[in-house]
Amino acid sequence: MSRPAAPDDVDTICAALPETWFGTSWGDVPTWLVPHRVRDGEKKGRGFVLYRRPHKTAVDPATGEMYDDLLVIRTANDDDKRALVEADGPFFTIPHFNGYNAVLVQLSRLGEISRDELAEVITDAWCACAPKSLVKTYLSDRG
């Protein structure tokens, strides 16, 4: 097992995946993106990891305070989302994300999983959002 995950690992893992870039989505939300389509000569991306700003829809039930360090990580489907949320780990969801294939995790709790586990979850998110041909090439190159 690798060392515990740390917040800095998120950007390192995302940047190592093919054809990713750091930009924004949903207006100004800091987001790791992968190509989705080209429109009017401009590359459009699909977000697979988002740094969510504090919002009234995401409140810590223990303190009543808005979470201020949330990461949103896409999942391939509801089954994958449920598996992460129900596992013994830091991933969870909130009613605002009902029907949306993504889990939440506090950056401050990433140390509860290993860096390898974080890399697997982020890579799965990338696979869920990247073009199928890119995913196929990436997975075949990894063996």
Where do the model's predicted regions map?
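Charge-dense, helix-prone N-terminal extensions
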Residues: 1-143
